Structure formats: C-alpha cells, structure tokens
Amino acid sequence: RTGFYMARDLTFYNMTASHEYEHERIKVLSGLMAGEYDAVLTTPDAALGYTVPPEILKKTTVAINADEPLDLPELAKRLTGAGFVRVDLVDSPGQFALRGGIVDIYSPFGTFADSDGDTKSGAYALRIELFGDDIDRMGLFEPDTQRMTQSVMAAELQPARELLCDKPALERLKKLIAAQFRATKNEDAMEELVRETTAVDAGINFTF
C-alpha cells in the first residue's frame, strides 16, 4: 500500500482552476492519518513544503449521518471552512450547492457507507434531501445527469483545500482589500477589489 505525495505548483490561480493535484495530496495525507499506507513516495520539494496540519485536517473533515438531524446553515459554514466553493450547480470536485431543501456536495476525497453498510472511499458527488432538519434521503448522484444512483447511510468529506482561512484570517483579508480600495483611484482595480470582497463574503476560496 503505497501513496505518492506530489509537490505543489506554486503559481497563483483562482477557484475555477483545476485542483486535481491538491486533492491528491489531501487524499494521501488523509490516508496517512487513517493508517492506509505502508509507504509514501515523494520528492524533496514536496516533503519540505508546508501543508495542512493533522489537527486541522481532522477538524475540517465533515461527517454526515442519514439518521441524524442536519443544520443547513451550519453545514454550509463548515463546508466553506473546509475549502468548498458554493456554486449554483455542482459539476466539479470541491463544490457544493444549496437549492431549497436539497444539498449537493462534490467531495474530492472521502468515505461513505452504502445501504449495505459497506464503506468505500474516493471522489464522489453526494446529494442530501431534507425535510425540515431531518434527512429524508441521501445518496450519490452523477454530476453530468444530476440523477441519484445509490443510497448512502453515512458520509465523511475531507477538506477540499490544503490552505484554509479561518474567520479571523478572512476578516484581516477584508481589511487589506478595503485599504487597497481606499488607496486606488483606478476604476478597473476598484471593480476587482469589490469582486474580491464579494468572493470573501460568499466563502469563495483563493489559494495557491
């Protein structure tokens, strides 16, 4: 049982960029915590690079049980804190959507237990249908067709990003953006700063 932990590409990109390699690193880190690997292959650059600490990885893992009530605003807050991006329609790993009493989450990596009690792991798209705070139905769905394919009794979602901003960090970021807004007279720059503030308020994550 061997994993490969690859180096991070230190180029800046926004939420629409592919995070495939980052998700692979989170998968390996999660596997290490769970004792799933006998060895991990990596490079000197990757081994020396900073990543999410074990306690943060554990803290930002989101667990959902079909038999337990679900607080929708709290779930949205936890997903945002775990690096997931809220969108209108889920089609890529690391996204989630809220539509009335329906929640769609595309986990880059996690585990789930099916209706037979068998536990599986990997990337998967999860749909939760609520009746009030109770889960009426929970299962996997195909992002391409938006159709549910099988029932799920429990799910554990690993964070979607390595570098996560907590609330104090986001508040500091908003203050920095506001200071830049006051200092600039360029209309294009001002519009971009407004978009950045809106993104922060909406829980959109920008990382590298």
Predicted regions and their residues:
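ASCE RecA-like P-loop NTPase motor cores
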Residues: 1-208
